Amino acid sequence: MRQITIVIFAVILFFLSSCMPYDSKKYVEEILKDDILEQAAMNLQESPVTITSFIAERSVGDCHDFYSEGDYWWPNPLDLEGPYVRRDGQTNPENFVAHRQAMIRFSSIVGNLTSAYLLTKDNRYVENVMEHVRAWFVNEQTFMRPKLQYAQAIKGITTGRGIGIIDTVHLMEVAQSLYRLEI
């Protein structure tokens, strides 16, 4: 967890560098370079894992459709087969979260590798970023369909909601990374 926090901090500093009057890139290099490169070295060994690796049994979509369930919705104790009921602020630990976790992993790996590339200009990092990006968005067997029709589903109420876009907030790091890599 410490390494992830350090890498996230480093990425934030890189992105804020254009707004700061001092050389934040030099500061990041001096303080965090070793940790960033260590994490990126581990990420180079990791194969892409997309949502197609995790079957969402309750989804009406197929393996290419991102699926998540509303956090605060629970089985109704008075009717276990009926629609779920809301428990504000109480996350249901039985909810399907594998697609969210895969996306968080993807964005973390891409961010880490991008940070390492910005520090070293070593093209291995860019090549590995692109391997993950192709797996998520291009490869016919592993891609994620570019819609969120089944995100934030609630059993017995809806197969998905527009608020599901919040589950993809992590893709901002991927987009920023690709922008920084000028791809």
Segment roles from a protein language model:
Residues I6-V7, W73:
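Short amphipathic alpha-helical "recognition" segments used for binding
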Residues M1-I4:
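Positively charged n-region of N-terminal signal peptides that target proteins for export
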Residues C19-I183:
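Extracellular glycan-targeting catalytic surfaces
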